[in-house]
C-alpha cells in the first residue's frame, strides 16, 4: 500500500469512529447524541478607558455560582438531614458575596407581577425535593433510595450510585430542572433583555449626559450606561451555550450575530450614537429570543428526547423535564417592539397540559401529534408558531 493510500485509509477509519460511537447503545440506557458542531474560538469583548478595562461582569459570575450550588443540591435531592437542607437554602436565600438568587427572580418592572408566583414555585420545588430526600423522616436514606415509578417519586437511573442520577416527582418531573429553567429565564434572561437593555435606560437624558461627561461610578472605570450594557453581556454568557445549535441551520449565525450586536452596541455607546445602540438592542432581542425558543422546542422534540422516548420513558424524563424548565424563559423574551412573546399564564397552561393525568409517564400522549393536547410535538409547535419557527427547523438531519 502506498503512503497516499495508507493516509486515505487512516482518514476513512477516523471518519467512521464518530459514527460508531454515536450508534452504540444498550437496552435501558439513556441515549444522548454525541454530535458536536464545529467549535470556533470566542471573540474577545474588550473595552478600555485611559488604558484600563472599563468592563466589569464579576457580579454575573458570583450570582451564577450561588444559583449553581442551589441547583446542585436540588439535583441530588440529598436533604436527608437538617444541616444539608439549611446549606441548600442558604445558597438560595443568602447567596455568595451578597448576591442572593431568591432576591433576583423576576425583578424587572415588566415581570414583577409574576414574582410572587415564581417564588412560590421555587418553594414547591424545595418541598418536593425534601419529600424525595425523605427529609424529616426516620428512614430518610431508604426513601431517597427508592426508584421513581408512575405515581411515585424517586430516583431515575439503574441504581442509586449512578453518576448521572436525578430525582423525579410522582408526575415524572425532575424538579431540579424546573429550578434551573426558572433561574435561566427569570434571573439571567430577565436581566439581559428587561433590566440592563431596557429602552428606558438608554433614552434617559440624565444618564446620557452623565455618560457623555465621562462621569464614572464611584471607584470604578465605567459610566452607568456602560455598566448596564456590560452586565447584559455578562448575563448573556449563561445563554451562550444554547447558541451553538449542534448543526442546526436556524442557529448557524446566532452566536456571531449576538456577539456582533453586543460589541457594536457597546462601541456605539462609546461614540454616543444612541440610535445605533437602540438598533443593536432590537437585534439582541430578536436573536436571543429565537435562541430561547429553539432551546425549548429541542428539549421536547430533539434527537435526545425522541430516541429515549422510543426506547424507554424513564430515560426520556430528564430531557422532557429540561423542556418543562425551558418554558419558564418564554415570558422573558421580547419582540423588537419590547412586548413579550408569551405570557406567564400561557406557560402555566402548557405545563398543566404536560403534567395532567399520568403526567410525563404517559408516553402514548407525549408521542402524539401536533393536534394532541399535551403531546411534545403540540407543545413545541405552539412555541414555534409564536416565533415563526417550524418543527423541522429544530431537528438535526440524521
Residue ranges and their predicted role:
Residues 14-15:
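Hydrophobic alpha-helical transmembrane segments of integral membrane proteins
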Residues 28-398:
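Mature extracytoplasmic or organellar-lumen-exposed domains after removal of signal/transit peptides
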Residues 18-22:
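C-terminal motif of bacterial Sec signal peptides marking the signal peptidase cleavage site
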Residues 1-10:
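Bacterial N-terminal signal peptides that target proteins for export
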Amino acid at each position: 500500500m502506498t503512503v497516499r493510500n495508507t493516509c486515505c485509509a487512516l482518514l476513512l477509519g477516523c471518519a467512521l469512529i464518530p459514527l460508531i460511537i454515536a450508534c452504540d447503545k444498550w437496552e435501558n440506557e439513556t441515549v444522548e447524541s454525541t454530535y458536536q458542531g464545529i467549535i470556533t474560538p470566542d471573540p474577545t469583548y474588550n473595552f478600555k478607558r485611559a488604558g484600563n478595562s472599563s468592563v466589569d461582569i464579576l457580579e454575573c459570575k458570583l450570582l451564577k455560582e450561588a444559583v449553581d450550588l442551589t441547583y446542585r443540591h436540588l439535583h441530588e435531592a440529598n436533604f436527608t438531614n437538617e444541616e444539608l437542607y439549611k446549606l441548600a437554602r442558604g445558597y438560595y436565600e443568602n447567596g455568595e458575596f451578597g448576591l442572593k438568587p431568591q432576591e433576583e427572580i423576576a425583578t424587572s418592572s415588566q415581570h414583577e407581577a409574576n414574582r410572587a408566583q415564581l417564588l412560590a414555585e421555587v418553594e414547591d420545588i424545595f418541598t418536593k425535593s425534601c419529600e424525595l430526600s425523605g427529609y424529616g423522616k426516620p428512614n430518610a436514606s431508604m426513601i431517597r433510595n427508592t426508584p421513581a415509578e408512575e405515581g411515585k417519586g424517586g430516583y431515575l437511573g439503574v441504581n442509586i450510585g449512578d453518576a448521572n442520577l436525578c430525582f423525579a416527582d410522582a408526575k415524572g418531573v425532575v424538579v431540579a430542572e424546573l429550578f434551573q429553567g426558572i433561574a435561566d429565564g427569570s434571573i439571567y434572561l430577565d436581566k439581559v433583555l428587561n433590566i440592563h437593555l431596557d429602552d428606558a435606560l438608554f433614552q434617559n437624558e440624565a444618564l446620557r449626559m452623565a455618560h457623555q461627561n465621562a462621569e464614572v461610578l464611584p471607584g470604578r472605570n465605567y459610566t452607568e450606561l456602560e455598566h448596564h450594557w456590560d452586565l447584559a453581556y455578562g448575563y448573556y454568557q449563561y445563554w451562550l451555550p444554547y447558541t451553538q445549535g449542534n448543526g442546526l441551520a436556524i442557529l448557524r449565525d446566532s452566536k456571531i450575530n449576538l456577539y456582533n450586536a453586543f460589541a457594536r452596541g457597546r462601541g456605539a455607546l462609546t461614540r454616543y450614537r444612541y440610535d445605533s445602540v437602540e438598533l443593536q438592542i432590537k437585534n439582541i432581542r430578536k436573536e436571543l429570543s429565537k435562541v430561547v425558543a429553539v432551546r425549548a422546542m429541542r428539549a421536547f422534540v430533539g434527537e435526545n428526547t425522541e430516541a429515549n422516548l422510543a426506547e424507554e420513558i424513564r430515560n426520556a424524563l430528564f430531557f422532557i423535564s429540561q423542556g418543562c424548565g425551558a418554558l419558564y424563559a418564554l415570558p422573558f423574551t421580547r419582540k423588537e417592539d419590547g412586548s413579550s412573546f408569551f405570557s406567564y399564564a400561557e406557560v402555566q397552561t402548557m405545563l398543566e397540559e404536560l403534567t395532567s393525568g399520568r403526567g410525563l409517564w404517559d408516553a402514548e400522549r407525549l408521542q402524539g401529534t401536533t393536534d394532541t393536547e399535551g403531546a411534545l410535538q403540540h407543545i413545541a409547535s405552539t412555541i414555534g408558531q409564536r416565533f415563526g419557527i417550524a418543527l423541522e427547523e429544530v431537528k438535526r438531519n440524521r
